């Protein structure tokens, strides 16, 4: 049995520092790098690409809404055409850095509010999927299972990678609990590790609003900008490997 462990990186810009890139890269098998819209100055993106290269980490594009002030976590009312163009632009930007360092683009995973909007808005999901397909129809697209986002990715003929979040709480509906909801974040590394094991080995996890929810996971996400992200990533990876689960890129 195997699973990918991913984290966001390269999101710092100017005087603003986000994440724990140097501590996280040795612990994950893939990374989603900012492309300049929600975060990531050119220098920081290049630095993250070189860190990924040094640690043998697969690199994906992490396009977001054009919202540096809100770190891409505020929804924006963009048309499907705007989403398509923005995603295509950002994939291309990261690809330039990867080409310069002799690395391939491994996957695409939208960031923050763009990801969440795609999960419930079919036109946004379709625009993302078509942008990825236009750039490279062989590129995998990371999605939340059971959403219109997954459906549109499959309709576009893309390779779909199903994602789960051991340090985020789920609702019975299968959706992630809103960040504003008490208990929506799992901050204890050991609890996150326990949840990761259930997700991978049992295909389910307890829901914040009671009961359990089915989970399908090709990759597990650790949010790199959380204060204790390295500790969570380390605990999750160690628990998986001790259970005989191989951690490697999809």
Curated annotation (Swiss-Prot):
TM segment ranges: none
UniProt GO molecular function: 5-oxoprolinase (ATP-hydrolyzing) activity; ATP binding
A GO biological-process term: carbohydrate metabolic process
Top class in the EC scheme: hydrolase
Hydrolase found in the keyword field: yes
Reaction catalysis annotation: 5-oxo-L-proline + ATP + 2 H2O = L-glutamate + ADP + phosphate + H(+)
Its biological purpose: Catalyzes the cleavage of 5-oxoproline to form L-glutamate coupled to the hydrolysis of ATP to ADP and inorganic phosphate.
Subunit details: Forms a complex composed of PxpA, PxpB and PxpC.
Family the entry assigns: Belongs to the LamB/PxpA family.
Name of this protein: 5-oxoprolinase subunit A
Organism field: Thermus thermophilus (strain ATCC 27634 / DSM 579 / HB8)
Gene that produces this protein: pxpA
């Amino acid at each position: 049995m195997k699973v990918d462990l991913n984290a966001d990186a390269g999101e710092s810009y100017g005087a603003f520092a986000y994440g724990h890139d140097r501590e996280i890269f040795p612990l994950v098998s893939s990374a989603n790098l900012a492309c300049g819209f929600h975060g990531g100055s050119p220098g920081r993106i290049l630095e993250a690409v070189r860190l990924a290269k040094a640690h043998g980490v697969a690199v994906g594009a992490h396009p977001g809404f054009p919202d540096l002030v809100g770190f891409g976590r505020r929804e924006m009312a963009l048309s499907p055409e705007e989403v398509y163009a923005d995603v295509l632009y950002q994939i291309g930007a990261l690809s330039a850095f990867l080409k310069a360092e002799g690395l391939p683009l491994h996957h695409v995973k939208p960031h923050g509010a763009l990801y969440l909007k795609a999960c419930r808005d079919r036109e946004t999901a379709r625009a993302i999927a078509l942008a990825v397909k236009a750039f490279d129809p062989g590129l995998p697209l990371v999605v939340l299972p059971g959403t219109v986002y997954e459906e549109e990715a499959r309709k576009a003929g893309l390779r779909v990678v199903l994602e789960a979040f051991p340090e985020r709480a789920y609702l019975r509906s299968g959706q992630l609990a809103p960040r504003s909801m008490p208990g929506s974040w799992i901050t204890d590394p050991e609890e996150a590790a326990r949840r990761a094991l259930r997700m991978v080995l049992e295909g389910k996890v307890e829901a914040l609003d009671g009961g359990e929810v089915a989970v399908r996971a090709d990759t597990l996400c650790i949010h790199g900008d959380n204060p204790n992200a390295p500790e969570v990533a380390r605990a999750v990876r160690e628990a998986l490997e001790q259970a005989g689960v191989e951690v490697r890129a999809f």
